[in-house]
């Protein structure tokens, strides 16, 4: 397990979450906070560079390698790198040989051959697209790809995003992330902009099936255990820049540790309302 955190440094001065740090001191302060939490808790850190709209060129790669040294020297041994071409060069690994590299959820990895290609490039940890959790035959094929990678000496971990609450197959999501990752100055974050009126912020108000369309892991513990048994290694919990979602993620961790049957108890109330006691949501 690890604690992933927003990291702002050239060439990554923005990411898909959309928050703008007004000064360099703000960005450095966020890093120092993360380092302090890691020191106090013993939980390893994972630096997140979640912007596929930063040009994947050689100059930016070299800028990244130079600026990452501060984090590496302070004990960060895991990072989300958004560009396969950068990882494929091997430059990052040569400079930082102990670094474990994650891909980004923004690449929407959902095919076995994509998993094999990423493992061959040098990724250690593959974030799968959230839609995979609703397609068991596809998940089984991806797990077979993981086993194939192991047979070739490329051990990887597979991760599912557990509780982001985004709809599966959302037609707006890529544009939402692009908007945030390219916003500057005083531009509002996506969901505070007028264009978001055609997105999930409206759907959630008018579609009574909104909760059922969210690509979350179902709330029952047995469903989470089924994913582990199937070959998923990591559940990625949301909340990097959302205090309420962070609270929900911490509650899930506590419930898992306590062996509770229900990971998200709010669903109990929902089930009572629609007279669906113990009916699985799949």
Model-flagged regions — what are they?
Residues 1-114, 124-282:
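Active-site pocket-lining/capping segments in soluble small-molecule metabolic enzymes
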